[in-house]
A protein has these predicted regions:
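Nucleic-acid endonuclease domains
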Residues: 1-82, 87-200
């Protein structure tokens, strides 16, 4: 074998490691792992819009139409005439976190919605958004995320807020009312009640 062909062998070995570590291989949602980041966001927006339509909740969600550079002017759309920024994340291969890129001005929406997709279920977390001061002073993001602060890279640019299955399960366990776990047994009516209980 020569150095040129060595790369073929190294790539094949790495691909095999990926296949073994692929948490999505048996998931109904497996194709989300293959989508580009922007398309993952579109999936979340479409999901939330269709849930609202099913439950006859007034909504107009289409980030492509509402988004401005750096986090937009009022999020990805509206639910019950309130602006909502929707962030969709897929569980990383290490199964440790959902990474939410919030943009440069995340405070401009009234509400934030996180749609966190894991191989066997989905977490939908909706909460009243934080103020500009809250984001910029990196305060803890309670009550939903009392141990987390948004990250602001170098004090400028985009903000980020990562969550995890454990954090989401904690929100549910403490009955905070801001997170619901969507499984094969979850009904549209349950999701409608959940959305209506938060967005007034």
């Amino acid at each position: 074998m020569n150095p040129y062909n060595l790369l073929v062998s190294v790539i094949a070995a790495q691909k095999q490691k990926e296949l073994v570590a692929n948490i999505w291989k048996d998931s109904k949602y497996k194709y989300i792992a293959e989508l580009e980041s922007n398309n993952v966001g579109n999936v979340g927006e479409n999901l939330l819009q269709q849930i609202c339509e099913n439950q006859q909740i007034a909504s107009s969600i289409d980030g492509a139409k509402t988004k401005l550079k750096g986090g937009g002017d009022g999020g990805d759309g509206r639910i019950k005439n309130k602006s909502v920024e929707i962030k969709t994340a897929r569980l990383g291969a290490n199964q440790a976190s959902f990474q939410h890129e919030l943009g440069e001005h995340p405070w401009k929406a009234d509400y934030m919605a996180f749609i966190d997709v894991a191989p066997a279920h989905i977490y939908l977390t909706i909460f009243p958004n934080f103020t500009e001061e809250h984001y910029k002073t990196l305060l803890k993001c309670g009550p939903c995320f009392p141990t987390k602060s948004a990250t602001w890279r170098k004090g400028e640019g985009a903000f980020k807020l990562d969550t995890s299955p454990n954090i989401n399960e904690n929100i549910i366990e403490k009955k905070m009312g801001n997170c619901i776990k969507i499984t094969d047994d979850t009904t549209f009516d349950e999701l409608g009640v959940f959305i209506n209980s938060i967005i007034q």
